[in-house]
């Protein structure tokens, strides 16, 4: 099929080449022989009057013209797939959809494992690829290379639809033997104590508390920098260092490590974790089903963890009461 002299099948070939950066892999992806893919490249070069790709070692490197074509071609193909091509009615139990989701280890441990467990029961052929957060997550959504991202709302753009999942609060955490956390933590002490801090994923994305401090021109003392939340607790053991982590995640690690939890000094805010998806998938039945699963599991987790939060608040109040009583006796 041609449009203004362009064989539209060539756009499928161009999209595969941009995604795979390999002639052989691109041909395999769209079920073409390698000679047929080579012929498609020649026709693309002729139509666009540009080399489009150059070989560097065993990898195809796109020209600036090819880079400029990549996003609109991907969007056009996604629009055709989602809006024009007729699809069978969606049946989760029969679906073999693979969802690519960008998220951090905090979300994986405290939330997404419940989602995966439920999907395994209700849609056993549905699979997931969980990827580290990247700087260009907004662009990856636009190109359809990610189906969802799960992030704190302040880190999301307005280019794609999103919906809130659950609220989370941060706490200070240290080794169970850390005597510095036995008394109320002031902001000055928080800033000057040695921190084990996280920069998330390949993007080295600052966590919510780091963004909060940097927005105010403040820098805390960081002794150890790690790339995932799960690396913080082991690095606290046997030291007087502290970390800042989501409460739900701390409660998870508290079952296997001797941790001491302390309230952060005011005014550290709570934050909302949200899910975002490509605007072109807004009406996609499979995406809608997955969103409903995410929302339902978030509501279920929130209802069960409210009891945990109330218990934690009660423990904190009891501890503060005991400390006040001791202080009054000493005075």
Curated annotation (Swiss-Prot):
PANTHER family on file? HTH-TYPE TRANSCRIPTIONAL REGULATOR LEUO (PTHR30118:SF6), HTH-TYPE TRANSCRIPTIONAL REGULATOR LEUO-RELATED (PTHR30118)
Domain HTH lysR-type: residue ranges: 6-63
Q: What does this protein do?
A: NodD regulates the expression of the nodABCFE genes which encode other nodulation proteins. NodD is also a negative regulator of its own expression. Binds flavonoids as inducers.
Keyword annotations of the record: Activator, DNA-binding, Nodulation, Repressor, Transcription, Transcription regulation
Task: Spell out the protein name for this chain.
Answer: Nodulation protein D 2
Further information: There are at least two nodD genes in B.elkanii.
Looking at the UniProt feature table, which residue ranges are given for the DNA-binding region?
23-42
């Amino acid at each position: 099929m041609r449009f203004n002299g362009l064989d539209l099948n060539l756009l499928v070939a161009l999209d595969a080449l941009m995604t795979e950066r390999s002639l052989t892999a691109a041909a395999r992806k769209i079920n073409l022989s390698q000679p047929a893919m080579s012929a498609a490249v020649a026709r693309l070069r002729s139509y666009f009057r540009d080399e489009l790709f150059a070989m560097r070692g065993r990898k195809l490197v796109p020209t600036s013209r090819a880079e400029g074509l990549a996003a609109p071609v991907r969007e056009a193909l996604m629009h055709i797939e989602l809006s024009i091509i007729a699809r069978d009615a969606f049946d989760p139990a029969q679906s073999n959809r693979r969802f690519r989701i960008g998220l951090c280890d905090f979300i994986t441990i405290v939330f997404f494992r419940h989602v995966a467990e439920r999907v395994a029961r209700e849609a056993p052929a549905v699979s997931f690829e969980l990827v580290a957060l990247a700087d260009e997550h907004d662009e990856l959504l636009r190109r359809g290379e990610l189906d969802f991202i799960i992030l704190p709302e302040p880190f999301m753009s307005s280019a794609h639809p999103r919906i809130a999942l659950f609220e989370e609060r941060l706490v200070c955490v240290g080794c169970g033997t850390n005597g510095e956390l036995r008394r109320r933590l002031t902001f000055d002490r928080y800033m000057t104590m040695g921190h084990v801090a996280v920069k998330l994923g390949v993007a080295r994305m600052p966590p919510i508390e780091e963004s909060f401090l940097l927005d105010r021109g403040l820098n805390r003392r960081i002794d150890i920098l790690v790339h995932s939340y799960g690396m913080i607790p082991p690095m606290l053991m046997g030291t007087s260092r502290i970390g800042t982590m989501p409460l739900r995640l701390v409660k998870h690690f508290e079952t296997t490590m001797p941790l001491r939890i302390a309230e952060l000094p005011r005014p550290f805010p709570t934050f909302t974790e949200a899910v975002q998806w490509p605007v072109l998938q807004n009406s996609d039945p499979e995406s809608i089903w997955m969103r409903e699963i995410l929302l339902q599991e978030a509501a279920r987790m929130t209802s069960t963890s409210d009891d945990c939060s109330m218990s934690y608040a009660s423990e904190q109040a009891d501890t503060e009461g005991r400390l006040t009583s001791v202080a009054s006796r000493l005075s």
